[in-house]
Amino acid sequence: MTIPAFGLGTFRLKDDVVIASVKTALELGYRAVDTAQIYDNEAAVGQAIAESGVPRNELYITTKIWIENLSKDKLIPSLKESLKKLRTDYVDLTLIHWPSPGDAVSVEEFMQALLEAKKQGLTREIGISNFTIPLMEKAIAAVGADNIATNQIELSPYLQNRKVVDWAKAHGIHITSYMTLAYGKALKDEVIARIAAKHNATPAQVILAWAMGEGYSVIPSSTRRENLASSLLAQDLHLDAEDKNAIAALDCNDRLVSPEGLAPAWD
C-alpha cells in the first residue's frame, strides 16, 4: 500500500476543533488523517471519523508512538490504546515520532517492537519521523528498508533537507513533509506569490504542489472549510521547471522544529 500523497494534519488541534476539522475534511474528500499519541486528540479524531460515516477501508490513518512508549514492553500496549481511542482495529501507518533522546531506548529495540506490531496486524505499515541519516541507517539495520514506509520530517521551501531526502530516496524510503508551509511564513514569500499569480493559484496551493511534485506526501492542517477545500486543489496544480528552480533557491536551512532535549543532531 502506498502512502497517500495528500492528507490532513491534526497537530495542535484538540477536542471540538479537531472534530470539526476532521469531519469537514472527510466531507470534502480527504481520506488520509495524521495524528499522534502526544497530540492528545486521537479520541477526538476517532469520534470524528465514526460520525463521518466514511467506511474504514476508504481511510488511511497514521499515528505516532511517543518517546515514553518506545520500550519493547510499552510500545504495543500504547498502540493498542491508540487504536481504542481511534475506534479502529488497526491503523494504516505507525511512526516512531522522535528517536529516543540520549538513545535511552535503542533504535533496534523500538523498531523491532514496531515491526512486531505490524506482524500482529495492529498497523499495516511502519515508519519513522525526525530521523537523521545515522538514525535511518540504524533503523534499516534493525528491520530492513522494505519495512520503513516513510520518514516524516520538517520540510518546507526554507528547509528543503536535501541531504536527508536524497539519502532516504537512495535507500527506498519515502518522504512525508510536515510544516510544509513553514508555520505560514512561506505564504508571505514574494517568489511564491509570483508563482501563485502566474498559475491563478494560492500560495498554499503552490507550496503543497511543489512538495508533491518532488514526490513527498503532505499533511496540511486547517480549521477553516475554505482552506481545507483550497488545499485539496493543490493536487491538480503542476509547476514548471522555472517555478521549481525558483522555489529550490529559497532553501536557507531555516528549521522551525527542534525541541531541546528531543531533537537529534541534525544532518
Curated annotation (Swiss-Prot):
UniProt: substrate binding residues: H97
UniProt entry keywords in alphabetical sequence: Cytoplasm, NADP, Oxidoreductase
Bilayer-crossing regions: none
Binding site for NADP(+): 179-231
Known EC number: 1.1.1.-
Chloroplast keyword on record: no
Uppermost EC category: oxidoreductase
GO biological process: L-ascorbic acid biosynthetic process; methylglyoxal catabolic process
One Gene Ontology term, aspect cellular component: cytoplasm
Main location: cytoplasm
GO MF entry, a single one: methylglyoxal reductase (NADPH) (acetol producing) activity
Active site: Y39 (proton donor)
Cytoplasm keyword on record: yes
Catalysed conversion reaction: hydroxyacetone + NADP(+) = methylglyoxal + NADPH + H(+)
Source species, domain of life: Bacteria
Compartment list: Cytoplasm
Pfam families: Aldo_ket_red
Assembly and oligomerization: Monomer.
Role played: Aldo-keto reductase that significantly contributes to cellular methylglyoxal detoxification by catalyzing the NADPH-dependent conversion of methylglyoxal to acetol.
Family per similarity comment: Belongs to the aldo/keto reductase family.
Name of protein: Methylglyoxal reductase DkgB
Species this chain originates from: Salmonella typhimurium (strain LT2 / SGSC1412 / ATCC 700720)
Organism lineage string: Bacteria, Pseudomonadati, Pseudomonadota, Gammaproteobacteria, Enterobacterales
Gene that encodes the chain: dkgB
